[in-house]
Amino acid sequence: MSTKNFRVSDGDWICPDKKCGNVNFARRTSCNRCGREKTTEAKMMKAGGTEIGKTLAEKSRGLFSANDWQCKTCSNVNWARRSECNMCNTPKYAKLEERTGYGGGFNERENVEYIEREESDGEYDEFGRKKKKYRGKAVGPASILKEVEDKESEGEEEDEDEDLSKYKLDEDEDEDDADLSKYNLDASEEEDSNKKKSNRRSRSKSRSSHSRSSSRSSSPSSSRSRSRSRSRSSSSSQSRSRSSSRERSRSRGSKSRSSSRSHRGSSSPRKRSYSSSSSSPERNRKRSRSRSSSSGDRKKRRTRSRSPERRHRSSSGSSHSGSRSSSKKK
């Protein structure tokens, strides 16, 4: 079979004998060269590409020939003499790999070593770490522990073998049989009752003192309220006395005003009569001076008792009266 006319199709298999390595058709059950039967070890062949044929070669107008093949992975058309694709390096004839589902990484699922380990109840694990249940305990060497246990057991045996005659073991029984009449067993009950009574008395005293202090604290508050009411009543009486004194002063002022007006009206005809009856001017001058001085004293007394508002009113009234008297004199 010539290599030019040889075409690999899907299903062809390679002889499992390494010396032979012949590629057989898919329909053969034994090797065509060495006669070895087809087994599961025989690797299947897979065509990485297909020839384009005459029709596509004619359409390319002399660019490709009928023996050229097209890659199945990248669809690139390669020359017939190429065993691998020019673009993606896919082989033209490749061995069909078994579908195991592995990813195909480095050394994956190949020569895997499974080390069988047995769990032990020892103090340390397989990595030399101390187990959790032994971490809190201070465990020493086994020989030391055994020696300590042996010493303790020997000490206990020696203690048991000692004479017990030196110890008075019957003293407890003698003490139980002794007379209890010397001891006052009821004293504790009496003391408890006395303590309860004293506690009750102290509580009653504290309550009475508390009530007295509360009554004392309430008495100054009542005295304060009384003093406040008295001060309020005194202030109200003072305000009333002030208002009554003001009313009295007002009534007195009105009376003095009316009397001054009546005096002024009566004095003018007197002056006229005196002036007409008197014969000498000197007597008239003396009389007018004495009258003016008496009228000035009266005015001063009235103005002292009056308020500043009344003084202003009296000054205005006196000016009017002066103008009236001057007009009458004229």
From Swiss-Prot:
GO terms for cellular component: nucleoplasm. Residues 117-330 are annotated as: Disordered. Keywords: Acetylation, Metal-binding, mRNA processing, mRNA splicing, Nucleus, Phosphoprotein, Repeat, RNA-binding, Zinc, Zinc-finger. Its main location: nucleus. A zinc finger (RanBP2-type) spans 9-40, 65-94. Belongs to the ZRANB2 family. This is Zinc finger Ran-binding domain-containing protein 2. It comes from Homo sapiens (Human). The lineage of its organism: Eukaryota, Metazoa, Chordata, Craniata, Vertebrata.
